[in-house]
Amino acid sequence: MVNSNFQFSYMLLDRLRQDCEYYLGFGGRCARQLWAHDEQAQINKMRELYDLVPEKPQWLTREQIDAYAKQMGVK
């Protein structure tokens, strides 16, 4: 069960994940399709939120975030 204090963080993290999927697919790798409008900023925010939430989501791992970063050409 999601801790209600972190509900927004989980929701935003999932939104960022979905943005990455779109960016890498039908979004044509256009940074303005991302929530952060910048690839590195998007990945940084995902890592920040992932580290913040006490219960890690089953639908996203740190390794997946790193894979998104690699596919997007950022660290």
Would you name each region that the model predicts?
Residues M1-Q33:
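N-terminal acidic leader/helix
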Residues M1-Q7, P57, E63, A67-K75:
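Short intrinsically disordered terminal tails
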Residues C20-R62:
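Acidic, low-complexity, intrinsically disordered interaction modules
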